[in-house]
């Protein structure tokens, strides 16, 4: 190796770096941001140390710098050491040094998860179809394979295309000790890329809890979900960005989501009855007794398996031949699985039972509210809307047969002008109690659907 190459690779001394700085006519070093940048880029302690982490959107120190520290993120103590180092060059303006740090970090930005995923080489062995059975004892079938594939590809796309539309949550359902949470923690590769700290969605700091994480487990919220909270979770999952201000910024900025959400529960009825659909939640039952290995039996082997799992998913992602949704046929399978984990719908059962014995040929939501559900008060709009969902969903699914929504509003003896439902083949009796109403009259009134 030549002497010139050796000299180029030798660390620059403080004297060497001083020679690179701009000076006043009297030889004094100028206290400029550019000189600060030159020092940060060439001082042998600080060179290549300061980088902007595009996942956490924080500045990291990525190499040893000669003082005790824990973690990668630049902190106040690090700043004191850097200020002391800069004094060797006669520069002590904290404001200019901080500005230079931000510029240098931005010019040396990196994304740790992208770097990890791009470094993987797939060995050609398929694991996506088997991983949930291998570690958790899930059934090996097309549904389980597609559920895992969609989740993995969604996680990859969120990293390479932050803010992309992905509102699906993979939910693992099984007894305690099955390793569900551990699976998601290891799937995130590094512990700092995983979080299970998202307890509430109405917390002012909820969005900060997403920052720097790739896979976020929502076990507690899923375990205690009810009809209201599940709507909040669905709305939360559908978001593609958060807008907030970090401490060093003057104005709030859009933060595109780079994370995906996972659910774990041992409740067999964790999905509230949702007549508008639970398409965002993909439940997969697991059984630890059927697993080939427990994920922590040999953590090193498990992590190597997961590396290859991501490598396989990256091969699919790079091919571009994928969709982040089930096929129409598989969507039916998903709905069947969701039914297995839904809570009992008491109101729907009462409406169905009422219709079985009802002899009239027409019915409206207010009538069902009073006569099927036994209420005596006037229903709120959301209550009539819920009854409409019961009827319309029941008819579309075939749970309610022989009924259809009538096209125009009709006048009911006890309940006034209402839209409602009529028998497909009406009996000869009962029709005289109702009168047709014109579309114009109906439009002048308000109806729940």
Residue ranges and their predicted role:
Residues 1-127, 142, 146, 377-382, ...:
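N-terminal nucleic-acid engagement/recognition segments and initiation subdomains in replication
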Residues 21, 40, 46, 52-55, ...:
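Generic detector of leucine side chains in alpha-helical contexts
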Residues 53, 68, 132, 261-263:
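A structural signal for short, well-ordered beta-strand segments
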Residues 79-83, 118, 134-138, 179-185, ...:
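Generic detector of short, locally flexible boundary/turn motifs and exposed helical patches
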Residues 88-111, 165, 192-198, 202-237, ...:
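Feature primarily recognizes SF3-like P-loop helicase cores of small DNA viruses
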Residues 101-211, 366:
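P-loop NTPase catalytic core of nucleic-acid-dependent motor ATPases
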